[in-house]
């Protein structure tokens, strides 16, 4: 009787899991069927940000001396988008200016007369397209399934059905690899900025770009392949092949793989807490106490229960406006995105901002691994970039996420500390001098010894 009851409960649990899964896929199908590309209302002239750079359609006005040098001519350069980065030292993270109080007839025309760029600054689109976009892939060397009896229960309902039909392992990560792909995107763009510079755009340094992308090929020989993320996830994070990764597991994989394969980049991870400790950070960035190595900070955090608490909206948006930003991996439950841009909402009655993201939920053939990167075709490289904009209002984001920052030197570190401290709303990252887990600094211990000695003298 107990066995019957247990089987009944298991059947009910499976049915409920299946219903929830079908509901989620139904919403995703609806989004795919109705997913118009966002447009930009030029009349509001709201800045749009991409990893610390701001773009507008506002005409640029320059001062230049007239030929007789007796007056100044103000020359307007129409349709030239401006690109700026945040100043140093940063005492407050700039936010986009407030919206106009209401829409106008001219603003409605901006949507009726759509241009090829949909109203977005061309420089912003070029920047967005130059960011590396990692997506689901198929037809790669199969990743073996786990023989652990707990593995099946860890998989989603859809993946359990798929494994029943296919006993040969996972030759595609569709349905389970989106957080890994978001993490790959974050790491790949960090390497691009480190090695090619923040101003790099598609069409420049093509061979160096191929060398970076080859490290993310869908092959065990590539250091940052899906295969190696899954392998380390199984060893260090208790994640089974085919199981969805969370921000914490993704951060641990990035840290381990990068520290093993990159001599020019270090990784500092906060784990599941938003606390950054300067002594621990410097131990990673300056292991010899002298030479500072560019260091990727990964902050794992949760900013609410089901949705992001509104008190964190401004601070979260501000992270994408910081020059050190390399994006956010997160999004929706079991449906991660890679966020790289932001723009304040154009509705005067709607607070908050829209965040622009690269969506990994698009399955393409596996990116091959080539020792000779000149063998990569243009089609191979094109699958790692997109000009198609997608955005999500901050209120609709999942509160669990992984936030990345690239600190290039000590000046960058000082600037970043100010950036995360002086934000509107409630701060989401805490910076402290000493990590309690590292024990008390030697000078602090000596000071306490002195106090104890003095105390003994007065007894």
From Swiss-Prot:
* UniProt-listed InterPro entries: Papain-like_cys_pep_sf, Peptidase_C54, Peptidase_C54_cat
Query: What GO molecular function annotations does the UniProt record carry, in alphabetical order?
Result: cysteine-type endopeptidase activity; protein-phosphatidylethanolamide deconjugating activity
Q: Which UniProt keywords apply?
A: Autophagy, Cytoplasm, Hydrolase, Nucleus, Protease, Protein transport, Thiol protease, Transport
The active site lies at: 178 (nucleophile), 359, 361
Top enzyme category: hydrolase
EC number, UniProt record: 3.4.22.-
Q: What is its main location?
A: cytoplasm
Where does it reside?
A: Cytoplasm; Nucleus; Preautophagosomal structure
Q: Which domain of life is it from?
A: Eukaryota
Looking up Pfam families in the UniProt record yields: Peptidase_C54 (PF03416)
Cellular component terms per the entry's GO annotation:
nucleus; phagophore assembly site
Question: What is this protein's function?
Answer: Cysteine protease that plays a key role in cytoplasm to vacuole transport (Cvt) and autophagy by mediating both proteolytic activation and delipidation of ATG8. Required for selective autophagic degradation of the nucleus (nucleophagy) as well as for mitophagy which contributes to regulate mitochondrial quantity and quality by eliminating the mitochondria to a basal level to fulfill cellular energy requirements and preventing excess ROS production. The protease activity is required for proteolytic activation of ATG8: cleaves the C-terminal amino acid of ATG8 to reveal a C-terminal glycine.
PANTHER family per record = CYSTEINE PROTEASE (PTHR22624:SF49), CYSTEINE PROTEASE ATG4 (PTHR22624)
* Protein name stated in the entry: Probable cysteine protease ATG4
């Amino acid at each position: 009787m107990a066995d019957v009851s247990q089987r009944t409960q298991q059947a009910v649990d499976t049915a409920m899991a299946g219903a929830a899964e079908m509901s989620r896929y139904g919403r995703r199908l609806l989004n795919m069927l109705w997913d118009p590309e966002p447009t930009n209302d030029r009349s509001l002239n709201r800045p749009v940000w991409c990893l610390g750079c701001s773009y507008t359609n506002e005409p640029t006005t320059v001062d230049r001396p007239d030929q007789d040098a007796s007056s100044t001519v103000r020359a307007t350069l129409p349709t030239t988008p401006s690109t700026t980065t945040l100043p140093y030292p940063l005492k407050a993270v700039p936010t986009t200016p407030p919206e106009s109080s209401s829409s106008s007839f001219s603003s409605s025309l901006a949507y009726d007369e759509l241009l090829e760029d949909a109203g977005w600054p061309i420089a912003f689109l070029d920047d967005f397209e130059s960011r590396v976009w990692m997506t689901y892939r198929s037809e790669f060397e199969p990743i073996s399934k786990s023989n652990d009896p707990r593995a099946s229960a860890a998989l989603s309902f859809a993946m359990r059905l798929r494994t029943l039909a296919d006993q040969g392992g996972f030759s595609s990560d569709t349905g389970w690899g989106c957080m890994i792909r978001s993490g790959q995107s974050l790491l790949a763009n960090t390497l691009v900025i480190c090695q090619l510079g923040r101003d790099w755009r598609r069409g420049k340094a093509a061979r160096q770009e191929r060398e970076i992308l080859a490290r993310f090929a869908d092959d065990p020989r590539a250091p940052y392949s899906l295969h190696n993320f899954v392998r380390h996830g199984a060893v260090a994070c208790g994640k089974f092949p085919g199981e969805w990764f969370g921000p914490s597991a993704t951060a641990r994989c990035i840290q381990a793989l990068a520290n093993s394969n990159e001599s020019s980049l270090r990784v500092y991870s906060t784990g599941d807490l938003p606390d950054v400790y300067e002594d621990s950070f410097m131990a990673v960035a300056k292991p010899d106490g002298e030479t500072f190595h560019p260091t990727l900070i990964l902050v794992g955090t949760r900013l609410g229960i089901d949705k992001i608490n509104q008190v964190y909206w401004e601070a979260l948006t501000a992270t994408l406006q910081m020059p050190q930003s390399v994006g956010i991996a997160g999004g929706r439950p079991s449906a991660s995105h890679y966020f790289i841009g932001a723009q304040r909402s154009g509705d005067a009655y709607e607070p908050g901002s829209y965040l622009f993201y690269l969506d990994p939920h698009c399955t393409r053939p596996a990116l091959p691994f080539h020792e000779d990167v000149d063998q990569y075709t243009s089609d191979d490289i094109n699958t790692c970039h997109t000009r198609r904009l997608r955005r999500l209002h901050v209120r609709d984001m999942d509160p669990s996420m992984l936030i990345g920052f690239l600190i290039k030197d000590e000046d960058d570190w000082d600037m970043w500390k100010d950036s995360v401290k002086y934000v509107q709303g409630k701060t989401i990252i805490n910076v402290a001098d000493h990590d309690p887990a590292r024990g008390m600094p030697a000078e602090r211990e000596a000071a306490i010894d002195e106090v104890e000695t003095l105390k003994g003298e007065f007894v």
